C-alpha cells in the first residue's frame, strides 16, 4: 500500500461505532445537546494498520510512504476528477498531519461501551474473506499508484 502519510498516529474508528452513535443520538433520550467526537480506542500509524491487516490475512502486504507530489501525479494520471484530487491532497497534507493524534471518550459516553478496536475489525473482516480478492498491493485500485510503488 502506497500513501503519502508518515508515522502520524490516527485514532481509526469503526464505521459500525459511528453508526451506533448516530442511531443512539437520534433515537434515545439523553443525547440532546451532546457533542460526541468519535475515535477508536488507540492511535495507529498507517504502517501499523497495514501490518495488522497483513497479519490477519496471512498475506504479505507492505506499506510504503510516497511523496505527496508523486501520489497526486499518479491520481491525475489515473484521470481522477480535479476536485477529487484536490480533496485527497487536502486530506493527506492538512488532515493527516498529526492534529488527530488523540483518543476521545465519545463512543463510550454515547453508548456506554468502549469503541471497537481496529484489530477486532481486521480479524472480523479477514474472516469474511473480503481481502482475498487476489489484487496485489502493486496492482492496487489505481494502476498508476501501483506503478509508482513498483518504481520505488
Regions found by a protein language model. Name each.
Residues 1-62, 66-84, 90-97, 145-152:
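Oxidoreductase cofactor-interface core, primarily capturing Rossmann-like NAD(P)-dependent enzymes
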Residues 13, 44, 102, 113-116:
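Conserved active-site and cofactor/substrate-binding residues in soluble primary-metabolism enzymes
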Residues 15-23, 104, 118-123:
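Short, amphipathic alpha-helical "lid/cap" segments that border enzyme active or binding sites
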Residues 77, 81-82, 102-103, 134-138:
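Short alpha-helix boundary/capping motifs
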Residues 100-109:
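Short helix/strand-capping connector loops at secondary-structure junctions
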Residues 106, 114-152:
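Amphipathic terminal alpha-helices
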